[in-house]
Amino acid sequence: MRAVAIFIVTLLVLECVYFVMSEPDPGQPWQVKAGRPPCYSIPCRKHDECRVGSCSRCNNGLWGDRTCR
């Protein structure tokens, strides 16, 4: 009887872990509009090259990727 109880508890624990580790459902399309402005893909070396749209500076610092921001 003890073995059956341990087996059932183990199955319940595994099911809880599976539920917690599963990925959430994707959001509605109207919620997934987080995107970067088109000027983020413009390569640059100086701030003057990035006066386009909402971008105003060049991300050319030590850890920068040399694109407009």
Swiss-Prot record:
Record's signal peptide: 1-23
Tissue expression summary: Expressed in the fat body, hemocytes and salivary glands of partially-fed female ticks. Not expressed in the midgut.
Tree of life domain: Eukaryota
Keyword Secreted found: yes
Record's keyword annotation contains Membrane: no
GO cellular component: extracellular region
Annotated localization: Secreted
Keywords, sorted A to Z: Antibiotic, Antimicrobial, Secreted, Signal
Any one GO BP annotation for this protein: defense response to bacterium
Function noted in UniProt: Has antimicrobial activity against B.cereus (MIC=5.8 ug/ml), B.subtilis (MIC=12.3 ug/ml), S.aureus (MIC=10.4 ug/ml), E.coli Edl 933 (MIC=3.2 ug/ml) and E.coli MG/655 (MIC=4.2 ug/ml). Non-hemolytic.
Protein's name according to its UniProt entry: Antimicrobial peptide ISAMP
Organism: Ixodes scapularis
